[in-house]
Amino acid sequence: MIKNIALSAFLLISSIFFAQNTAMSTTEAKAFVANVSSETKEIKTLQADFIQTKKMDFLDKSIITSGKMSLKSPNTLSWKYTKPYQYSIIFKENKIFINDQGKKSSVDAKSKTFEKINKLIVGSSNGKMFSDPEFSVKYLKNTNFNIAKFTPKSAQLLKYIKQIELHFPKNQTTVSQVNMTEASGDTTNIVFKNTKINAPIPASEFSL
């Protein structure tokens, strides 16, 4: 459960849009990465509402949840589900703090899996993810979006993640949706809206 929530969280931060995707040229890819990296390195805080849709093979209906994500540079992340249930997960000080409808717990985040997940979530908001040596990256585009498709090189991550797509609207350098395919074939899509960049975030957002 914790790993699924954490993986979904990396889901930090683009769209499943049924347009034809084509590969970017080398020049286009370099320009895209440079632009995103330059713009997002100025991000100190980021907040957004989200809607998450999870499709699982053994369920006929998708599981839809919603909530709020808050990020504070360099590596503090809050992921709070509010509907249809309350569940919070906070990455802070090399630990993962969890509040499952009033039941609180913490997990050491220094394990390779949790450490990587946290790094990827934060990296997706500051452009550093593009240079992560544990992922191969392909760059695609369509009429409305630039797309970065990440495939894990690490055998450890491949146990959980098959592929992650970050979709950036053409006129933006922050992710508007994340689409993840797990090793099992289950998929998770997170759509972000009402995004606020560098707005003050109360300390209470990063505590349970």
Region roles according to the model:
Residues 17-51, 55-60, 204-208:
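N-terminal leader/targeting segments and the immediate start of mature chains
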Residues 21-25, 37-42, 54, 61-62, ...:
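Flexible, processing/modification-adjacent segments and terminal tails
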Residues 5-14:
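Sec-dependent N-terminal signal peptides
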Residues 57-61, 88, 156-159, 184:
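Short glycine/serine/proline-enriched coil/turn segments at secondary-structure junctions
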Residues 48-50, 64-66, 163, 192:
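Extended beta-sheet lipid-handling architectures
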